[in-house]
Amino acid sequence: MTDHKPSKSLPKATAKRLPQYYRLFKSLVEENVTRTNSQLISEKIGVDAATIRRDFSLFGELGRRGYGYETKVLRDFFGELLGQDQETHIALIGVGNLGRALLHYQFQDRNKMRITQAYDISGNPLVGTQTDDGIPIYNISDLEKNVKKSDIKTAILSVRKENAQEVVDTLVKAGIKGFLNFAPIRLKVPSDVVVQSIDLTKELQTLLFFMNDNKQ
Protein backbone atom coordinates (compact mmCIF):
# COMPACT_ATOMS: atom_id res chain seq x y z
CA MET A 1 0.00 0.00 0.00
CA THR A 2 1.30 3.45 -0.87
CA ASP A 3 2.25 5.48 2.20
CA HIS A 4 0.11 8.55 1.67
CA LYS A 5 -1.27 11.05 4.17
CA PRO A 6 -4.20 13.35 3.29
CA SER A 7 -3.55 16.94 2.36
CA LYS A 8 -5.19 19.89 4.06
CA SER A 9 -7.56 20.05 1.07
CA LEU A 10 -9.23 16.75 2.05
CA PRO A 11 -13.00 17.31 1.50
CA LYS A 12 -14.86 17.88 4.76
CA ALA A 13 -17.43 15.20 3.89
CA THR A 14 -14.62 12.66 3.45
CA ALA A 15 -13.00 13.70 6.73
CA LYS A 16 -16.30 13.15 8.54
CA ARG A 17 -16.47 9.60 7.21
CA LEU A 18 -13.00 8.62 8.49
CA PRO A 19 -14.27 7.51 11.94
CA GLN A 20 -16.90 5.34 10.22
CA TYR A 21 -14.21 3.62 8.17
CA TYR A 22 -12.02 3.09 11.20
CA ARG A 23 -14.82 1.62 13.33
CA LEU A 24 -15.87 -0.68 10.50
CA PHE A 25 -12.40 -2.08 9.83
CA LYS A 26 -11.78 -2.42 13.57
CA SER A 27 -15.01 -4.42 13.87
CA LEU A 28 -14.19 -6.60 10.86
CA VAL A 29 -10.77 -7.46 12.27
CA GLU A 30 -12.39 -8.43 15.57
CA GLU A 31 -14.76 -10.69 13.60
CA ASN A 32 -11.74 -12.34 11.93
CA VAL A 33 -12.68 -10.96 8.50
CA THR A 34 -9.39 -10.50 6.65
CA ARG A 35 -10.55 -8.95 3.37
CA THR A 36 -13.49 -6.91 2.09
CA ASN A 37 -14.54 -4.72 -0.85
CA SER A 38 -16.29 -1.41 -1.46
CA GLN A 39 -19.70 -3.01 -2.00
CA LEU A 40 -19.59 -4.81 1.33
CA ILE A 41 -18.32 -1.66 3.04
CA SER A 42 -21.23 0.23 1.47
CA GLU A 43 -23.76 -2.24 2.87
CA LYS A 44 -22.23 -1.95 6.34
CA ILE A 45 -22.11 1.84 6.69
CA GLY A 46 -24.77 3.08 4.26
CA VAL A 47 -22.43 5.04 1.96
CA ASP A 48 -22.51 4.23 -1.75
CA ALA A 49 -19.60 2.21 -3.11
CA ALA A 50 -18.52 4.89 -5.61
CA THR A 51 -18.14 7.44 -2.80
CA ILE A 52 -16.09 4.96 -0.77
CA ARG A 53 -13.75 4.29 -3.68
CA ARG A 54 -13.41 8.03 -4.31
CA ASP A 55 -12.62 8.65 -0.63
CA PHE A 56 -10.01 5.90 -0.56
CA SER A 57 -8.38 7.14 -3.78
CA LEU A 58 -7.46 10.37 -1.97
CA PHE A 59 -4.99 8.37 0.13
CA GLY A 60 -3.23 6.48 -2.64
CA GLU A 61 -3.58 2.75 -3.21
CA LEU A 62 -5.44 1.34 -0.21
CA GLY A 63 -6.46 -1.82 -2.04
CA ARG A 64 -5.98 -3.77 -5.26
CA ARG A 65 -8.42 -4.16 -8.14
CA GLY A 66 -9.97 -7.61 -8.06
CA TYR A 67 -8.58 -8.29 -4.58
CA GLY A 68 -10.24 -5.72 -2.34
CA TYR A 69 -9.02 -4.28 0.94
CA GLU A 70 -7.13 -5.94 3.77
CA THR A 71 -9.06 -5.15 6.93
CA LYS A 72 -6.12 -5.07 9.34
CA VAL A 73 -4.07 -2.82 7.07
CA LEU A 74 -6.91 -0.32 6.73
CA ARG A 75 -7.81 -0.50 10.41
CA ASP A 76 -4.24 0.51 11.22
CA PHE A 77 -4.15 3.12 8.45
CA PHE A 78 -7.33 4.94 9.51
CA GLY A 79 -6.45 4.50 13.17
CA GLU A 80 -3.18 6.33 12.57
CA LEU A 81 -4.95 9.11 10.66
CA LEU A 82 -7.33 9.59 13.59
CA GLY A 83 -4.58 9.49 16.19
CA GLN A 84 -5.92 6.40 17.94
CA ASP A 85 -2.53 5.68 19.48
CA GLN A 86 -2.15 9.19 20.88
CA GLU A 87 -3.17 10.10 24.42
CA THR A 88 -5.49 13.12 24.01
CA HIS A 89 -6.40 15.12 27.11
CA ILE A 90 -9.45 17.38 26.83
CA ALA A 91 -10.81 20.33 28.81
CA LEU A 92 -14.60 20.61 29.19
CA ILE A 93 -15.97 24.11 29.68
CA GLY A 94 -19.52 24.28 30.99
CA VAL A 95 -20.85 21.73 33.48
CA GLY A 96 -24.58 22.25 33.03
CA ASN A 97 -26.94 19.48 31.95
CA LEU A 98 -25.10 18.74 28.71
CA GLY A 99 -21.70 19.20 30.30
CA ARG A 100 -22.49 16.72 33.08
CA ALA A 101 -23.59 14.17 30.51
CA LEU A 102 -20.33 14.68 28.61
CA LEU A 103 -18.32 14.27 31.82
CA HIS A 104 -19.80 10.83 32.29
CA TYR A 105 -19.59 9.86 28.63
CA GLN A 106 -17.37 6.86 28.06
CA PHE A 107 -15.44 7.29 24.82
CA GLN A 108 -15.27 4.06 22.82
CA ASP A 109 -13.23 1.23 24.29
CA ARG A 110 -9.50 1.49 23.69
CA ASN A 111 -9.86 5.10 22.57
CA LYS A 112 -7.27 7.31 24.26
CA MET A 113 -9.36 10.50 24.42
CA ARG A 114 -9.99 11.62 28.00
CA ILE A 115 -11.63 14.64 29.61
CA THR A 116 -9.13 15.52 32.33
CA GLN A 117 -10.34 18.97 33.45
CA ALA A 118 -13.74 20.65 33.65
CA TYR A 119 -14.73 24.27 34.32
CA ASP A 120 -17.77 26.33 35.26
CA ILE A 121 -18.66 29.57 37.00
CA SER A 122 -18.42 29.85 40.78
CA GLY A 123 -22.20 29.65 41.18
CA ASN A 124 -22.22 26.02 40.05
CA PRO A 125 -22.15 23.84 43.21
CA LEU A 126 -19.98 21.29 41.40
CA VAL A 127 -17.06 23.73 41.20
CA GLY A 128 -14.36 22.63 43.62
CA THR A 129 -15.43 18.99 43.51
CA GLN A 130 -14.47 16.10 41.28
CA THR A 131 -16.36 13.35 39.48
CA ASP A 132 -16.39 9.71 40.56
CA ASP A 133 -13.73 9.18 37.89
CA GLY A 134 -11.49 11.78 39.50
CA ILE A 135 -12.00 14.62 36.99
CA PRO A 136 -11.58 17.96 38.82
CA ILE A 137 -14.13 20.72 38.24
CA TYR A 138 -12.46 24.11 38.49
CA ASN A 139 -13.64 27.70 38.65
CA ILE A 140 -13.53 29.17 35.17
CA SER A 141 -11.35 31.99 36.52
CA ASP A 142 -8.54 29.40 36.68
CA LEU A 143 -9.03 28.34 33.06
CA GLU A 144 -6.12 30.06 31.31
CA LYS A 145 -3.64 29.38 34.12
CA ASN A 146 -4.47 25.65 34.40
CA VAL A 147 -4.58 24.94 30.68
CA LYS A 148 -1.24 26.68 30.11
CA LYS A 149 0.34 24.39 32.72
CA SER A 150 -1.17 21.25 31.15
CA ASP A 151 -0.63 19.31 27.92
CA ILE A 152 -4.23 19.97 26.83
CA LYS A 153 -4.69 21.15 23.23
CA THR A 154 -8.38 20.25 22.77
CA ALA A 155 -11.50 21.68 24.42
CA ILE A 156 -15.23 20.96 24.44
CA LEU A 157 -17.49 24.00 24.76
CA SER A 158 -20.83 23.54 26.48
CA VAL A 159 -21.53 27.15 27.39
CA ARG A 160 -24.11 29.80 26.52
CA LYS A 161 -23.60 31.39 23.14
CA GLU A 162 -23.21 34.79 24.83
CA ASN A 163 -20.10 33.53 26.62
CA ALA A 164 -18.65 31.23 23.97
CA GLN A 165 -16.39 33.69 22.10
CA GLU A 166 -14.86 35.08 25.29
CA VAL A 167 -14.09 31.54 26.50
CA VAL A 168 -12.57 30.63 23.14
CA ASP A 169 -10.36 33.73 23.14
CA THR A 170 -9.06 32.76 26.58
CA LEU A 171 -8.40 29.18 25.52
CA VAL A 172 -6.63 30.19 22.32
CA LYS A 173 -4.28 32.35 24.41
CA ALA A 174 -3.69 29.30 26.62
CA GLY A 175 -2.64 27.22 23.60
CA ILE A 176 -5.80 25.29 22.66
CA LYS A 177 -5.74 24.24 18.99
CA GLY A 178 -9.08 22.47 18.56
CA PHE A 179 -12.65 22.99 19.77
CA LEU A 180 -15.75 20.83 19.77
CA ASN A 181 -18.41 23.52 20.07
CA PHE A 182 -21.98 22.92 21.24
CA ALA A 183 -22.86 26.63 21.44
CA PRO A 184 -25.10 27.81 18.56
CA ILE A 185 -22.68 30.48 17.38
CA ARG A 186 -19.97 30.78 14.74
CA LEU A 187 -16.68 31.21 16.56
CA LYS A 188 -13.83 33.41 15.36
CA VAL A 189 -10.45 31.73 15.73
CA PRO A 190 -6.96 32.04 14.18
CA SER A 191 -6.22 30.08 11.01
CA ASP A 192 -4.22 27.44 12.90
CA VAL A 193 -7.13 26.59 15.23
CA VAL A 194 -9.84 24.10 14.24
CA VAL A 195 -13.50 24.30 15.29
CA GLN A 196 -16.03 21.51 14.88
CA SER A 197 -19.53 22.74 15.77
CA ILE A 198 -22.53 20.62 16.72
CA ASP A 199 -25.84 22.50 16.73
CA LEU A 200 -28.37 20.09 18.27
CA THR A 201 -31.34 22.26 17.29
CA LYS A 202 -30.20 22.37 13.66
CA GLU A 203 -29.62 18.61 13.62
CA LEU A 204 -33.12 17.95 14.99
CA GLN A 205 -34.68 20.39 12.51
CA THR A 206 -32.89 18.57 9.68
CA LEU A 207 -34.12 15.23 11.02
CA LEU A 208 -37.72 16.50 11.16
CA PHE A 209 -37.45 17.82 7.60
CA PHE A 210 -36.42 14.40 6.30
CA MET A 211 -39.13 12.71 8.38
CA ASN A 212 -41.78 15.01 6.92
CA ASP A 213 -40.32 14.58 3.44
CA ASN A 214 -40.70 10.80 3.77
CA LYS A 215 -44.43 11.21 4.41
CA GLN A 216 -45.00 12.81 1.00
Swiss-Prot record:
The record's keywords, sorted A to Z, are: Cytoplasm, DNA-binding, NAD, Repressor, Transcription, Transcription regulation
SMART domains from the xrefs?
A: CoA_binding
As one GO molecular function, the record gives: DNA-binding transcription factor activity
Would you indicate the residue range of the signal peptide?
A: none
Q: Where in the cell is it found?
A: Cytoplasm
Instruction: Kindly list the positions annotated as binding NAD(+).
Output: 94-99
Where in the chain is the DNA-binding region found? Answer: 20-59
- Gene3D superfamilies xref list: NAD(P)-binding Rossmann-like Domain (3.40.50.720), Winged helix-like DNA-binding domain superfamily/Winged helix DNA-binding domain (1.10.10.10)
Q: Which InterPro entries does the entry link to? A: CoA-bd (IPR003781), NAD(P)-bd_dom_sf (IPR036291), Rex_DNA-bd_C_dom (IPR009718), Tscrpt_rep_Rex (IPR022876), WH-like_DNA-bd_sf (IPR036388), WH_DNA-bd_sf (IPR036390)
> For this UniProt entry, what is the primary localization, expressed as one broad class?
cytoplasm
One annotated GO biological process: response to redox state
How is this protein annotated for GO cellular component? cytoplasm
The residue ranges crossing the membrane are: none
The record ties this protein, via NCBIfam families, to: PRK05472.1-3 (NF003989), PRK05472.1-5 (NF003991), PRK05472.2-3 (NF003994), PRK05472.2-4 (NF003995), PRK05472.2-5 (NF003996)
Q: Which family does it belong to?
A: Belongs to the transcriptional regulatory Rex family.
| Oligomer and partners | Homodimer.
Its annotated function is as follows: Modulates transcription in response to changes in cellular NADH/NAD(+) redox state.
Protein name (database record): Redox-sensing transcriptional repressor Rex
Organism, by scientific name, is: Lactococcus lactis subsp. cremoris (strain SK11)
Q: What's the gene?
A: rex
